[in-house]
Amino acid sequence: CIAAAKTKKTLADKIKAVVYGKDKGALYAWKVLASGLIYAANRVPEISDTIVEIDNAMKWGYNFEMGPFETWDAIGLKKSVDRMIKEKMPVPAKIKKMLARKKTSFYKTEKGVTQYYDFASGSYKPIAVSKEALSLAVLKSTNKPVKTCASASLVDLGDGVFCCEFHTKMNALNSELIDF
């Protein structure tokens, strides 16, 4: 599963390659990830009212690139829940109810606004964002990067200001980035 993951470009594809592989490592990774996802779902609303707060806590507190609900979206909510049920894992009722309502992801973006699934209302709600905050993901979804290569992207922030987003491992400089 590790060899397959190394061939993938995005974190989401790497995680999918690991947990949906067929070797012992993949089976172990699946069991650990699945139990963590179930645990996170069971903590709403016990420790947090929304999935956004749990995802942010894991990213900000533990330096994860994706929180548990973002990871769940990355591996496919329906596909993973089907597997959990097949393997007799205790899928939370709120997740089953969500899927019964034909909601197949925790997050979605419409017209540049990222929304999260709210268990309490059973609907998607916009993520509250400070007016001073900039999100490269949102900017890149509404405006294509001005220039891009395998090592970096140049994103227009507005007012003649640009952001150079590194894509290299550990944000290391390489010759392609220098030529960029």
Per-segment meaning from a language model:
Residues 1-180:
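N-terminal glycine-rich phosphate-binding loop for ADP-containing cofactors
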